[in-house]
Amino acid sequence: MSVRLVLAKGREKSLLRRHPWVFSGAVARMEGKASLGETIDIVDHQGKWLARGAYSPASQIRARVWTFDPSESIDIAFFSRRLQQAQKWRDWLAQKDGLDSYRLIAGESDGLPGITIDRFGNFLVLQLLSAGAEYQRAALVSALQTLYPECAIYDRSDVAVRKKEGMELTLGLVTGELPPALLPIEEHGMKLLVDIQHGHKTGYYLDQRDSRLATRRYVENKRVLNCFSYTGGFAVSALMGGCSQVVSVDTSQEALDIARQNVELNKLDLSKAEFVRDDVFKLLRTYRDRGEKFDVIVMDPPKFVENKSQLMGACRGYKDINMLAIQLLNEGGILLTFSCSGLMTSDLFQKIIADAAIDAGRDVQFIEQFRQAADHPVIATYPEGLYLKGFACRVM
C-alpha cells in the first residue's frame, strides 16, 4: 500500500481545480512514512484519491503534484511522455522563430514541478529545484538520454531554493561532453555567447527573447541606456535596431566582457557601445546629477523579492529605480521596464510605475505590455507560472 497524504476537510478544492501544490496547512495527517521527495498519493478527508505527488516534509509546499491520473505511475515512461509533449510546442516555436535554444521544460506548466530544462544547441541544462525532482533525477536523466542521444546534459542545480527542502546544491556534467566556456546560440538574427557552466541561472535569460526583439522598434537613431545588462542581449538588439549609442551597465566585469564579445560577434559598430561596471542605483543618480539624458532606457533588474515579507521593500526598490530612469529620459522617451519577481503582480507593478512617474514629476503612457517568451508557458491552473512582466512606457 502506498503512503498517503490525507487532506483536512474542505482543503481539497485547489486540487479539484488541478492546482499542483499542497500546502502544509492543508494536511491533516500522513498514513505511512515517506522519505524526502518520495512519491505519495494525496486523498481527501474521506480517503478519496485526488492526485499523486512528491512529498517534502520540510517545505511549506508539502507536496507537488506529478499527476491527476490514478493509473499513471511516476517512472521513466512518465518523464518520456511529459518531455515529448513539451517538445511538440518547442519544435513549432523553434521552426517558426528560427531558434536553436529554448526552454524545454518550464516546471509545473509542463507537468513537471520543480524541473527546469533549457536547451542550448546540443546541450541540455538541468535545474532540479524541489525534493521530488531530485528524487526522480535518475528516471528523468534516463528519459533525456533516450529522447536526446545527441545532447550532453549539464546540471545547474546550484540554486539556493534547494536548501529550503534540505538539499545540497549540485553543479557539473551529467552525461556527454563538457560545454565550451562560451557557447554561441542564435536568437532573432543575433548571435550570442552563453556561459552554461558559470553564468546566471542556466547561463542565459531565454525568457526575455521577445522583449529583446521588441526593443528594436523603439531605438533607431536613439541613445539607449541598458541597465542590469548582463551579457548584453538588449544591447546587441538595440544596435541591430539602429541606435546611435547604447550604454550597458552591470556590476559584473565578466558579464560586460561577454557583452562586448557579443557586439563584436555580430559585426556591429563597437564605437556605439559603452560598457560600464557600476551599481545601477548609484550610477542613475550620478547621471541625473550631471544632467545626462537618454531616449530609451531598458530596466531589467534581478529579482527583488523572494517571499511575501520582502514585498514592501521590493516595491520601494522598484519605485526608486524607475523614478530615476524616468527622470533621465528625454521628452517622448521610452522606458522598457521589467520585474521577474513572481510575487509582483502585473497590476501592482503598473501601479509602482505610475507612482514612480508622479515622484519624478512626469506623465507616463503605457504603450506595450510584455511577459515571458512563449517557450515559458503558463498552464491555466497555475497562474503563479507567470512571473515575468514588463511595460513599454512613453514619458511625456
UniProtKB/Swiss-Prot annotation:
Chief location category: cytoplasm
Domain of life: Bacteria
GO function term, MF aspect, one: rRNA (cytosine) methyltransferase activity
Reactions performed catalytically: cytidine(1962) in 23S rRNA + S-adenosyl-L-methionine = 5-methylcytidine(1962) in 23S rRNA + S-adenosyl-L-homocysteine + H(+)
Entry's localization field: Cytoplasm
Residue ranges annotated for the PUA domain, each copy included: 2-81
Pfam family, one: PUA_3
GO cellular component assignments: cytoplasm
SMART domains membership: PUA
EC number of this enzyme: 2.1.1.191
Keywords, ordered alphabetically: Cytoplasm, Methyltransferase, RNA-binding, rRNA processing, S-adenosyl-L-methionine, Transferase
Function: Specifically methylates the cytosine at position 1962 (m5C1962) of 23S rRNA.
PANTHER family from the UniProt entry: RIBOSOMAL RNA LARGE SUBUNIT METHYLTRANSFERASE, S-ADENOSYLMETHIONINE-DEPENDENT METHYLTRANSFERASE DOMAIN-CONTAINING PROTEIN
UniProt record similarity statement: Belongs to the methyltransferase superfamily. RlmI family.
NCBIfam families, sorted: PRK15128.1
Descriptive protein name: Ribosomal RNA large subunit methyltransferase I
Organism: Shigella boydii serotype 4 (strain Sb227)
